[in-house]
Amino acid sequence: MSDRLTLLRPDDWHIHLRDGAVLPHTVGDVARTFARAIIMPNLVPPVRTANEAGAYRERILAARPAGSRFEPLMVLYLTDNISPEDIRAAKASGFVYAAKLYPAGATTNSDSGVTSIDNIFPAIEAMAEVGMPLLVHGEVTRSEIDVFDREKRFIDEHMRRVVERFPTLKVVFEHITTSDAAQFVTEAPANVGATITAQHLLYNRNHMLVGGIRPHFYCLPILKRNTHQVALLDAATSGNPKFFLGTDSAPHARHAKEAACGCAGCYTAYAAIEMYAEAFEQRNALDKLEGFASLHGPAFYGLPANTDTITLVREEWTAPESLPFGEQTVVPLRAGEKLRWRLLEKNA
């Protein structure tokens, strides 16, 4: 088994960079590995127009490390009031690549999200017409639905209907967490894809709950049982081009995670490709990592794959206990733990 793994440079098709003073830290971490990333729009206030997306993009570009060519791919936040004209203007901008459906209340800063999918059907129709993908946080949010069942219920109540009603629309079922979602995407038409996070490949709910609550494993959609983890590993390592890398790296300051009511999100951008390599190695599927990380996503979005490469070496290193996050700190996933793969820096 080789101790070096060279891949075409990957992209991250789902990441949260936040805003303001933290951007130099979050942008630096993602730019270390990835050439491009789909930037989540759930700021406060959210990114709802092409102009707001353009302003956020400029702040991200200004935060890039010296010499970095990292490219942020911007996303609109869908609300009940978004119009087809907003969609067309975003497409015409040249820098907005998708629009995001957050069911109201589903996750961090989703209070402005969609209260009924029917409300945005005119906007979705415009997206299908102009070729803009719909990115979906696929969970129902009604309080009577168990948190572990919300993804499956979303498929049954909404996802099938959207895919059937808009047969030409590209749809990304984001951060899937269940065997139900993996099966749905596998059986859906070619215009339906999915991202999978590193944490959902490496962990299940036992890691979060057994022996004490581990808040840094808490994310939404929540970690599920082992059988779902196995199904996600099957999908990610299958070579099926419908499945591609999306970290959903989502930083929160330490005090916001280690709290009586902690925030949802795992910070993985600092070592994401290293974690994916561990997951694929568990399946003896390192030969499938380049497709998942570097080829399937660009193909789905109709973009060229990157031409430069990265190299991972099999070398243990210890993840930092914390990382700078503006004036605060963020505790990354795997803090203080050993990782088995290390990204070889260009000057190494």
UniProtKB/Swiss-Prot annotation:
GO CC list: cytosol
Reactions this protein catalyses: (S)-dihydroorotate + H2O = N-carbamoyl-L-aspartate + H(+)
Its EC number(s): 3.5.2.3
UniProt binding sites for Zn(2+) 2: 100, 137, 175
UniProt-annotated binding residues for substrate: 16-18, 42, 137, 220, 252, 264
Residues recorded as bearing N6-carboxylysine in the entry: 100
InterPro entries given in the database record: Amidohydro-rel, DHOdimr, Dihydroorotase_CS, Metal_Hydrolase
UniProt: Zn(2+) 1 binding residues: 14, 16, 100, 248
Protein name, per record: Dihydroorotase
